[in-house]
Amino acid sequence: MEEKVAAIIAALRERYPDALCALHYGKDYELMISVRLSAQCTDARVNQVTPALFARFPTLEAFAEADVAEVEAYVRSCGFFRHKAQDIVAACRMLRDEYCGRVPDTMEQLLRLPGVGRKTANLLLGDLYGKPAVVCDTHCIRIANRLGLARGKEPEKVERQLRAILPPEESSDFCHRIVLFGREVCTARSPHCDRCELRPYCREFSGE
């Protein structure tokens, strides 16, 4: 398994040298907000919405004191806008009041923030602090199963399995690359197996 994992990591690194988050942000709390908005929404849509949102509320304090209804108006096109707006304002208030205005750097503290689950917390830990992080979104879960790196569809279960086999220093970048690969090649329906660099390692393609 160790050799297989190393080969998969190398192939993904060659295809995507820059393992970057697709969300646009300038401040740590802006990434937290963008990730919250991305739930059940595309990164492209979030990136269309956030410039105006961040211009209207240019500081953490501005978000913490924001009228939730006004935030709703800015994020309406992201879906589930009422819940997302409530979480954004509440999370920013908690950052201001309990975390000295900074996004915390531990899983336990992050999970206390409204609207922040393990997927969001892992992304923040990996992108903001360079910590080992396994972001189990739908792409990661699907491809990990197809490659035989994990079994099951429960995010926490898949996260544990991937943590057990991925080198910690590679885990965050691996997940960013898997998302890109899932969008371009290993799609949910009609995956492009004919041009897949990971085909030699694919359990589903080999019929196992």
Predicted regions and their residues:
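Catalytic cores of DNA base-excision repair glycosylases
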Residues: E2-E208
